[in-house]
Amino acid sequence: VIRIFIRVGALVGTALLTACQSVPMGDPARSAELKKFAPNPNAGQIYVCRDDRFFGAAITPTVELNGKPVARLARSNYFFAELPPGDHTVVIKTLEHDSKFPFKIAAGQQTFFSTWISFGIIAGRGIIDTVTTEEGKKCVSSSELVGPIEAATAK
């Protein structure tokens, strides 16, 4: 019985280590520019930020915007997009759960989302919610911009 627990523990440990993948990073100069939080009068802007919480650190959820995968977020990372005014949907996808957040955005508006990993049955569940402008700017200011998801699959 003890051998079975040791083997299962080794498998779980290996799975956690292999799940701890890096994500493609964005341009540091662009990140510095985005952290000025200058609104675009012709488009809405969204920031999706994952803070540095330790729980779920090995999980890199996929961010989908309007049905298209656009980024993966590790701890202390954020994703940025400019969108035409109107209705949109952002989704955080993990192995076990899709967290969807439909929203409406206007030209010149900035919307901040926070994402984190909560407990799940098999793996952590990605959760997304809006945060205040102040909370969003604080998270983004202490995080790094991720690159597009295509950069991860091109390697």
Question: Over which residues does each language-model region extend?
Answer:
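Short loop/turn and low-complexity linker motifs enriched in small/turn-promoting residues
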Residues: 20-155
